[in-house]
């Protein structure tokens, strides 16, 4: 059975405050764990929208589970080996801009968004001379980021405090 918000008791959806480029294991096990902890312990009250464009089905797999997944935590706590499972519920949605460019651009209009994170490697931070601002979407990570940031700048009418 898939996890989803109908069969697992989790927090209500919070406003999206973080746009995350990528859905790899590191981001899901580190960045989202920190956001989850900030929600539970420090009143962050924010969720994540994932921009996932490498795998054609990655976003839909995340959305099938309403953004929920189980994180396995292993380590030493107070000198004792521990192994814990935690359901991460801070992902609201995943969007593939190659399949739904308008939904990708709509992230720029979300009033609560304050952060963009990515762990894009040097292989993904490249210049492509054929990328155009009018491409829907551009092909490279930097160009997609520029499209999103320009959308945000336009949405907030240049207000740097938003």
Residue map of PLM features:
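Non-transmembrane, aqueous-exposed alpha-helical and coiled segments at domain scale
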Residues: 1-162
């Amino acid at each position: 059975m898939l996890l989803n918000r109908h069969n697992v008791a989790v927090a209500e959806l919070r406003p999206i405050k973080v746009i995350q480029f990528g859905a790899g294991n590191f981001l899901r096990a580190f960045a989202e764990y920190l956001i989850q902890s900030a929600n539970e312990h420090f009143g962050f009250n924010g969720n994540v929208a994932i921009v996932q464009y490498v795998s054609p089905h990655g976003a839909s797999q995340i959305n099938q589970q309403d953004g929920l997944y189980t994180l396995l935590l292993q380590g030493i706590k107070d000198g004792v080996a521990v192994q814990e499972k935690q359901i991460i519920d801070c992902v609201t949605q995943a969007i593939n801009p190659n399949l739904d460019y308008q939904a990708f651009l709509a992230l720029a209009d979300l009033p609560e968004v304050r952060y963009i994170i990515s762990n894009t490697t040097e292989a993904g931070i490249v210049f492509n001379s054929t990328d155009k601002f009018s491409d829907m979407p551009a092909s490279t990570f930097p160009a997609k980021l520029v499209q999103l940031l320009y959308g945000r700048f336009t949405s907030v009418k240049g207000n740097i405090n938003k």
